Amino acid sequence: MSPNPSQQSSAVAFHPSAAPITLPESATWPLADVLALFELPFNDLMFQAQQTHRAHFPKGDVELATLLSIKTGGCEEDCSYCPQAARYDTGVEAQKILELEQVLDAAREARASGATRFCMGAAWRSPKERDLEKVEAMVRGVKQLGLETCATLGMLEEGQADRLKQAGLDYYNHNLDSAPEFYSNVISTREYQDRLDTLGRVRQAGLKICCGGIVGMGESRQQRAGLIAQLANLNPYPESVPVNHLVQVEGTPLYGIEPLDPIEFVRTIAVARITMPKARVRLSAGRRQMGDAVQAMCFLAGANSIFYGDKLLTTGNPEAGDDLALLAKLGLKTHASTLTEAQKERCGG
């Protein structure tokens, strides 16, 4: 018998927890209200999510975003899900940051295949000065190709977000990963407040925010609701919300954990859509293990963005041709196909 999705057990060791992070009394989406959405009958939840989706995205298009690892492995953090953490034996070797032309070649390929957003990710705690200068050059180069630019570089210090904005960055990705009350199960080398502080610096610099989390790490339904509540109550909530399904990698502490029920993942997408109606809700890691039927339900629930390309940082992803075939089967258009020529020219702006 499969486990009750609302009571998924955790196989992760507990770390000492920091001061609790709580929602303000004036929260737009109190935890109880978000949890109530999760507990709706499935058809009722899907109906409400689809109504919300159609009201805010009448074209019904799906954004294709490509993610490139510009610096792989050797990270000093201890994220329990991550094969790039240096302390875990996962077969991922540390590599130096890519050269500018390597990044631009990948961006050109992404643009040619239909992607409209290009995200650059680095496995480190935070960027050093020499790294930031290289990333700034990458951002400028990708921007000149007419792509929306996104970067995920870990925690940012004062002034770093402003520099990225000046270089032409559109979005900064910095996920919350989980609900605050589950966070100590996942990582001990960074506090939840550190993540919130970085998001504050990003927003203050005038950048758009890409922020989501990971489900299927052993959290309960209430803790999944807690993650969505944290995201929905950011003021304003993120423009992009990547929802990752845990990809279990041998050698990481989360390897072998009980998988999340697929219907519970679809519920998470639907609740994200209802609580953050104008956001691009992105199907991120874990799509290869879902199959077409679960992904189709996710699109019905309000997902309207995917990471596109055969690799996400270090883990596998569906082939680009398979993604395009699935979208065609479902009658879904890509975001690029709905843009006018003028919009395409200023896509990166």
From Swiss-Prot:
Its cofactor is [4Fe-4S] cluster; [2Fe-2S] cluster. Binds 1 [4Fe-4S] cluster. The cluster is coordinated with 3 cysteines and an exchangeable S-adenosyl-L-methionine. InterPro entries: Aldolase_TIM (IPR013785), BATS_dom (IPR010722), Biotin_synth/BioAB (IPR002684), Biotin_synthase (IPR024177), Elp3/MiaA/NifB-like_rSAM (IPR006638), rSAM (IPR007197). CDD domains: Radical_SAM. Its EC number is 2.8.1.6. It is an enzyme of class 2 (transferase). Pathway: Cofactor biosynthesis; biotin biosynthesis; biotin from 7,8-diaminononanoate: step 2/2. GO terms for biological process: biotin biosynthetic process. One of its GO terms (molecular function) is 4 iron, 4 sulfur cluster binding. [2Fe-2S] cluster binds at residues 119, 150, 210, 282. The keyword Ubl conjugation does not apply. Keywords: 2Fe-2S, 4Fe-4S, Biotin biosynthesis, Iron, Iron-sulfur, Metal-binding, S-adenosyl-L-methionine, Transferase. The keyword Transferase applies. It catalyses: (4R,5S)-dethiobiotin + (sulfur carrier)-SH + 2 reduced [2Fe-2S]-[ferredoxin] + 2 S-adenosyl-L-methionine = (sulfur carrier)-H + biotin + 2 5'-deoxyadenosine + 2 L-methionine + 2 oxidized [2Fe-2S]-[ferredoxin]. [4Fe-4S] cluster binds at residues 75, 79, 82. Residues 60-287 form the Radical SAM core domain. Gene3D superfamilies: Aldolase class I. Homodimer. Belongs to the radical SAM superfamily. Biotin synthase family. Catalyzes the conversion of dethiobiotin (DTB) to biotin by the insertion of a sulfur atom into dethiobiotin via a radical-based mechanism. PANTHER family: BIOTIN SYNTHASE, BIOTIN SYNTHASE, MITOCHONDRIAL. This is Biotin synthase. It comes from Albidiferax ferrireducens (strain ATCC BAA-621 / DSM 15236 / T118) (Rhodoferax ferrireducens). The gene is bioB.
